[in-house]
Amino acid sequence: MVIVYFVPLPTKSQHITFTRMNRKRILALIAALITIGVTKAQDTVDIWNLPPLSIEQGRYTTDWDNLSRQYNTPAWWREAKLGAWSHWDPQSAAEDGDWYSRGMYMEGHPQSKFHREHFGHPSEYGYKELCRDWKTDLWDPEDLMQLYQKMGARYFLALGNHHDNFDCWNSKYQPWNSVNIGPHQDIVGIWEKVARKYGMPFGIGFHSTPARTWGQFMPVRYTSDKQGDKAGVPYDAMLTKADGYKPNADGTDKWWKGMDPQDLYGPIHHDGRKSLESPFANQFMWRVDDAIRKYQPDMIYFDDHAGDSQVDLGIDMGLGKLTPQIIAHFYNIADKRTEGRKEVVATFKGVGGRYNSFQRNPEMVGIVDRSLVKSTELYTEDDIMAFPFQTEVSLQEWHYQKGGSYRSAEEIITRLMQNVSRNGCLLLNVTQHGRGNIDDEARQICLDFGRWIDINQEAVYSARPFDVWGNNDVIYTRQGGHIYAVILHPSSNPIVLPALSSQSAS
């Protein structure tokens, strides 16, 4: 909508000479009014009826064969070996573990019981209230980035969104975001600036994929208790924008007046199996594009499968047909931005292995593997891989769990070296409290881990697999004509390295 101001003509006594400067001012005013109108229109965009995203054109196309021929995993990422991850969002505020925004709505679930005891019934205090009350006052991104570097990390990933559907940036296509709601901060934007300041390649993680969010998280919220005093009372996910204009019992306005809960919880649907055909799939593409263009990441991560043949919790998983579109779009944008000087990384799950999402067309696995970096959450490949991969692990729970235990520095070292020896990298989430800080125990583990890497860095950074990766006692890597043997369980006994015998060494 463009607003036009009509200026009355001057009387003879108020005669105005329309000089060139006057005309410039008038044109500037018109341009400003048009800009205001466009901005207003963008602010009120219907995120459930967006046109298809136009894929950025360039040397990469949406054809898998083209992608596999054109793409090379960048040297900066292959040499880095270790990345730090901030897997942190409003769900962290509850401090009751991962997938909280789903479990809190499932009557009988431990997280549902916790939520009612600590916050209230989800008809009165739903996930939108947890987002509203998310505070980040103890978050010190500069301190954490320095810790990540002391830990030995050489790239950093921020959580853009999780399955909860809340965006942690100044999102153009999701009004339920960290600038409008909760901390009123551009979390991703702040992380991006700090990472660049400390010379860390920057990435964004997208977990709000159609299968996870539309298929698994949204439908469980459209219900009510089956038992107890609140039986039959709808949870807050059933509310609409119109409900926000109804005053509270005491006559006050609802805090979310003007916002639409269905933008967070989704339009009510009870069958999320075919999520790629939903209006959410198109919205998801626009949100990814928005973050890519705003923050120019060196890496993007997707917590979902590249193919579409896996089923989880009764839902067809994977980005399927969207995967090559996302990859080509991201690669071409980065290619133009850097004039081809710097390659970027796109990470997806389910490319071969135990969770292969190309079961209907297994011949695609090798082609897809060459087109991106495959992700293996919590699972290290069994042998040396032909193409680089990434394993993601968390120091504690993915979202902070009060009373949860930590992995030791020794376990993280083992995980890292298992990956390096098999042609992979490790991405480590240093679990944050809801308010953004970390425990002293977590800090100490990071420092201990970092000291080990500093001493043994030749066996880590830029290293490549040896002829064999090793065994449960010793792990091998190589670099610059040298072979490194990492002893996992040092003892006073003689060390035997069978892989280096004259019969087996090359």
Segments and roles (model prediction):
Residues I16-T19, I36, T209:
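Juxtamembrane/membrane-water interface recognition
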Residues P10-T11, V38, G83:
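A composition/secondary-structure signal for short, hydrophobic, low-basic-content segments
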Residues Q42-S506:
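Mature catalytic domains of secreted/periplasmic carbohydrate-active enzymes
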Residues T19-L27:
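Bacterial N-terminal signal peptides that target proteins for export
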Residues Y5-R20:
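Short, Lys/Arg-enriched N-terminal segments with co-localized hydrophobic residues
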Residues S13-H15, R25, A41-D43:
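Intrinsic disorder/low-complexity segments enriched in polar/small residues
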Residues A32-T39:
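Hydrophobic h-region of N-terminal signal peptides that target proteins for export
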